[in-house]
Amino acid sequence: MNCVRMRLQCRLMPSSNTLARWCLESPQKNLTLHRPRISNVALRQASTSVSPKTRETEAEAKAKKLDQKRLDEHEEEVRAREQQVRRPWHREGADKPPVEGNADPIAKGKLLTTPTRLLKLILPLPLRVEKDQKNNGRNNEYGRSISLNSDIQPLALLIHPQQPLSYVERLIQAELPPVVENGQEKIPNVYFRAEDSEQGDQKPTSRAEARSKDDGGEPSEYNTNLSHVASYSGLGHRGPKRSSQDKRWVRWSSSTEMGDFIRDAARGREFAIEIEGYNIEMRVSVPSFGDRTYYMRQRLRKMSSEIDGLAKIKHECDLLAHRSAHRLAKGGFGLLAGWWGVVYYVTFHTEFGWDLVEPVTYLAGLTTIMGGYLWFLYINKDLSYKAAMNVTVSRRQHALYEMKGFDIERWEQLVQDANALRREIRVIAVEYDVDWDETRDVGEDVKDVLDEERSRRDDEHRSIEKEKDEKFTEDEKRKRKKDKESKETSGDS
């Protein structure tokens, strides 16, 4: 049925050439054109029947439009990235909070270490100061109202270990509203409290003491009273928990340095900051030795890896330089042996004899002595085998360093910085009473290299100081001699 209908529709739609021919052949008078009745389906098919060229142009236009749209989107994305690099505050979604969702409120403060020497103190202040328009005065200044923080926003402070507690106290006071006492406003005082040291651990410190304690005897006279000895652990917040009944708090003076206070507070897990007038006590966890030296040890490991690679190149160059110096020394001995052989042969196996060889040997020996004396006057140093070897080795070393691409200035700077970091970590280890095993962070080979370079630098420093002292004594002698001569000349006149 569909096929028959489609054939009828096709017959009802004659082509343009057939219609024109039919119009020309028919007479104009009796011409009566009747509009053919065409169904909607035939009209829709006629409208959709497009030539292949038209379809190609439409497809190309759509493709160009899509390509242009993609290019525009890419350009906008690149422009947005450049804008973010130039102005980070104009990034996408800058008006949205960085963290979505409700975070748990901080109930305990922390003392964190930073890559620098500063310490980051985070305090959960439960108070905040708001502007109150009701207390607005004539000066159009908003009054302050005190309210509790439902969501505590921690306060971050950067502190240097050598700054006193009074500095931290002033920083905290600047963030607090004044308290009213006897009708007058007063800045609240801030107190720092740390756990008191235990009254000695009563542990034996020697075999004799342990043996006497096992036998039921009294300990030695040097350890009869350990209540005046403070115990240190250095564990900080990683230490064992103790109940609040076992803790005894001691208030520290505001003139104490922050580093000393932290060192003493590290025996416990935390210290307390009390604010007068608000009955607020904030507990702050204390960093352990590992936390305090985390970034230092990380930098030391990074330096150690670089020092290890440079040390291998330096060791190879130094070994070649010493071999060259020893070859040169052996060559000098061979030259002297050859000279002895020539003198022996000319003296006993030729017709010239000792009469000719004797003055030649005298002149050659005297020339050698004069040349060595002139060289000693030129270098103005001790004439010794060690000094000559050092000069020869150092020249060969510098030549090999340049050949291998070894930067001696970079090496010295790395060694100096690494030794400074080691010294600083040792100081902190002494403060925390902790034995620091540096081979775990540095390595045995790098540790030996650093110790060797430090001893060499110390020897050079001592030799330089010795030369300065000798020069100073010589100058003083000359000055005294001149003063004595001037006094004698003035007395004679």
Swiss-Prot record:
> Does the entry feature the keyword Lyase, yes or no?
no
Tell me where it resides. Answer: Mitochondrion inner membrane
Select a single GO molecular function from the record's annotations and give it: identical protein binding
Give me the ranges of the annotated region Disordered: 44-107, 193-225, 230-249, 447-493
Q: Which residues cross the membrane?
A: 327-348, 356-378
A GO BP entry? protein homotetramerization
Q: What is known of its domains?
A: The selectivity filter, in which calcium ions are arranged in single file, is composed of two acidic rings separated by one helical turn along the central axis of the channel pore.
- Which protein is depicted? Calcium uniporter protein, mitochondrial
Originating gene = mcu
